[in-house]
Structures are given as C-alpha cells and as structure tokens.
Design a protein with these regions (language model features):
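Active-site and adjacent substrate-binding regions of carbohydrate-active enzymes
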Residues: 1-48, 72, 194-257
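Glycan-binding loop/region signatures in secreted carbohydrate-active enzymes
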Residues: 116-213, 239-262
C-alpha cells in the first residue's frame, strides 16, 4: 500500500479520501527518526511506477529525504493487473523511467538503490490480439474487475523456490527454453502462442546488464532484491548480482565510499 492511495482498496476507498497521507507520510518518517535517533539507519521502499508517486513530489521529497538514509526503488512489478498491454515488469527502460522520475523530484542518486526481482510474472493476453507478431505492447485480457478492483486471475507471479503451478508448468517450460532478451526495452520475456501467456522475468544475464545501464550510468548508491529466499535453491540471480557489486567495489566506482547493497 502506497501513501496517498492506489492500494488494493482503491476502488472502495478512492484516492481523494487519502489526500491527508501526502503530508502525513513525511511526518511519520520524521517521528521515526526522532524516536530512533541520528545513528540508526532508516530506509523506505518506494514505488517504481510514476502513476503511484502520489506522495512523492518535489515538495515532499526534501522532507522525506531529511529523515531517511536512502530509498529502495521498487523497480519491479512495473507491469501489473492494472495494465492493459504487455511490457517488462522489471525492464531496463521502465526502471530508468522510475529512477529519472525520482531524480527529477530531487532525490540524490547516491541515496537510491535499484530493485531486482527474484521471481517470475505471467499475464494472460487477449486471444484476438496479434501478440505473436508484437509480443511487447500487445493487448492483455481484462485482469482486474473495473468495478471492484479485484484480481480476475489473469495474471500472477511465483518465485524460483516455488513449485510451478500445474496449469502453468508446460508454458513455463517453453518460456525457459525459448525466452528471449529485448535489447530495446531491456527485459527477458516469452510469449506463449499456445496459451496466450506473456512471461516476464530477469535471467542472471539480464540482471547484470542493469549495472552499466542503470547503476553506473545514474551513479546510484546501491542495489537490493525482493527477495533473498525467492532465489533459492540455486541462488543464481544472487550470485550474479553479488559478482557485479563486488566488481564495482573493487573498481572504486561506488559513490559514497560505503557498500550499502542489501544483497
């Protein structure tokens, strides 16, 4: 749930009734800082979709940053059931859009951590859409009830340590075998023509591409992942990320002289 709305209950409690949270959120963080003192490290996980930045404005950002040490930018779930066309859920380009949006609002780059997703997402596409020819930007099935906001079961996610749902197992096998990397959007994906399913996830190789393209380019302070246990039992994504973090440390390219990765 994000400050100032767009949460699970946004159809029942409209954003207009949560306007008060815009001013309350910095006050909450300030109270935490006062209670914990200046020596404790405070971070906040914040949305990666600009449409959810309702409480993060050029006015509130300075107040927020005066109380926290850094922000964990959730650059994943950038496609969800409220979307109506396919896109990468944790791609390079939409991650850059999130980082740039926070930079434009006044967040120092060294105070931002880029988020990695240690899980897979899938979405049902419209059977009448030409997703085979245009898998990115293709029309999805209706994934959310327009009246209630409830999940219609046309999208989902699971972790690497999870058992793949039986009804998705064959499609996911095809995704693993034939998935491809979109060099334009910067994301790994697969479109299953047999079941009209769009798959979006990071391979270890796709994940490491984000270091030069985002972390180094924007001179960010670090990285984090959601979540550690979700990469079990092989921890391939964790090893890939840790390898790049160590490389940055060894090359002296981090900004603030202190490793702050949460991996």
């Amino acid at each position: 749930v994000y400050p100032r709305g767009n949460g699970e209950d946004y159809k029942q409690i409209p954003n207009s009734k949560k306007e008060w949270e815009i001013a309350a959120y910095p006050l909450l963080l300030a109270s935490l800082r006062t209670a914990l003192g200046p020596s404790k490290r405070i971070s906040a996980a914040v949305p990666g979709l600009p449409r959810d930045f309702r409480a993060f404005t050029p006015i509130t950002i300075p107040e927020i940053m005066s109380s926290v040490d850094f922000l964990n930018i959730m650059t994943y779930d950038l496609m969800n059931r409220r979307d109506n066309v396919t896109k990468h859920h944790t791609g390079i380009q939409n991650s850059l859009e999130a980082i740039d949006a926070y930079l434009d609002r006044g967040v120092p780059p060294e105070k931002m951590n880029l988020g990695f997703a240690f899980y897979v997402k899938w979405f049902k596409t419209d059977a009448d859409a030409d997703c085979k020819t245009h898998p990115i930007g293709c029309k999805t099935a209706l994934m959310e009830d327009p009246a209630t906001g409830h999940d219609l079961g046309k999208a989902g996610a699971f972790s690497w340590h999870d058992e793949v749902p039986a009804e998705l197992a064959a499609s996911f096998d095809r995704a693993l075998a034939d998935g491809t990397y979109d060099s334009k959007g910067g994301g790994h994906y697969f479109f299953d023509v047999e079941e009209d399913l769009f798959w979006s996830w990071d391979t270890p190789d796709a994940l490491t591409k984000k270091f030069p393209a985002i972390v180094e380019k924007k001179r960010l302070g670090g990285v984090f992942a959601w979540g550690l246990g979700e990469d079990a039992p092989r921890f391939e994504h964790l090893r890939a990320a840790n390898g790049r973090v160590r490389r940055l440390v060894e090359e002296g390219k981090k900004n603030d002289g202190e490793a702050r990765s949460e991996l």
